[in-house]
Amino acid sequence: MKFDTVIMGGGLAGLLCGLQLQQHGLRCAIVTRGQSALHFSSGSLDLLSALPDGQPVTDITAGLDALRRQAPEHPYSRLGAQKVLTLAQQAQTLLNASGAQLYGDVQQAHQRVTPLGTLRSTWLSSPEVPVWPLSAQRICVVGVSGLLDFQAHLAAASLRQRDLNVETAEIDLPELDVLRDNPTEFRAVNIARLLDNEEKWPLLYDALSPIATNCDMIIMPACFGLANDTLWRWLNERLPCALTLLPTLPPSVLGIRLHNQLQRQFVRQGGIWMPGDEVKKVTCRHGTVSEIWTRNHADIPLRPRFAVLASGSFFSSGLVAEREGIREPILGLDVQQTATRAEWYQQHFFDPQPWQQFGVVTDDAFRPSLAGNTVENLYAIGSVLAGFDPIAEGCGGGVCAVSALQAAHHIAERAGEQQ
């Protein structure tokens, strides 16, 4: 099977790269093993929240300039501030065109409220998510009886420290009892599958309506809206106060929705989606990828003009830690890591951990190297890249988006030259 590009990995980076390549008229396939890290995320995307020295970032342009001085090998630093901002804006446009209506400004971070009621700097958020400063003084944090993925009293306690009048309440929906037989089934995603049925909407409205008359804003867990935000908008039009949603413990409704919106758009535009499959071997000839062998297509290789590695980091098995060191399991690419295992981590758990910055070695075009030699038609994007800490620096989503579009532009340019 011949393709212009085969992308190994169906997470945020892989999907955005595929969508951008489709804009250039290239035929793409995505090989994906299972759920991506988006299923376990908040659904919000960070661009740059903090510098390596711990300094928080609000002005993104100034933050990118400072980042280049502190971390010259960071993926952003390799591109330059203006290029990062341009690609981030393009990514935001691409997300919105795919149906993921995320709001934010590439120049200025905003503060979203987290499930614990604290604030986190971010780039893009769903319209349901409450953003600081809140537009209300009287707030009620509402939990769902029996839902362990969200603790209303913890969020309320944090918000009260910000001089807000915050109460808590709990709604009990007997219609959800079918899920209570097994506590592991009473999760936000399973609740959403029931509540998203239009016939159930009035039940949720009836439960929230008495609470809404006594406050200016309701904050509740995101336990509906797997496909879109229609129910949230329907409730907001009818309730006498604003309704906002907080992501829950994983799996996350908002994260799954974002992934599904991008995946559906990729398929609608003619992309080949290969779920439940896994790349087992990649054949390289003369420094280029010539064939990609997958588990489900055992004796039928995929033959791409270009290949993209978007396999993620340790969480997605894009990187594997062994006693002897860190390795990239698909091609055995060169990996940036510390010399000894003892240097992988810091003693204090909440300190920035060196292993977070491990990843494949690439040139400035994000082409990785194998035994010191650049693989000419292979690009690495997203969390598999080296040189950044997605947790401490708050840049995971941004690196995925920016590197994906940068690689897509490179491929499109080279594909045009080869025609």
Curated annotation (Swiss-Prot):
Bilayer-crossing regions: none
Catalytic activity, reaction form: a quinone + sn-glycerol 3-phosphate = dihydroxyacetone phosphate + a quinol
Annotated GO MF terms: glycerol-3-phosphate dehydrogenase (quinone) activity
GO cellular component: a single term: glycerol-3-phosphate dehydrogenase (FAD) complex
Pathway membership, UniProt: Polyol metabolism; glycerol degradation via glycerol kinase pathway; glycerone phosphate from sn-glycerol 3-phosphate (anaerobic route): step 1/1
Cofactor(s) listed: FMN
InterPro entries the UniProt entry points to: FAD-dep_OxRdtase_2_FAD-bd, FAD/NAD-bd_sf, G3P_DH_GlpB_su
Keywords: Flavoprotein, FMN, Oxidoreductase
Pfam families: FAD_binding_2
Function: Conversion of glycerol 3-phosphate to dihydroxyacetone. Uses fumarate or nitrate as electron acceptor.
Protein family (similarity comment): Belongs to the anaerobic G-3-P dehydrogenase subunit B family.
Name used for this protein in its record: Anaerobic glycerol-3-phosphate dehydrogenase subunit B
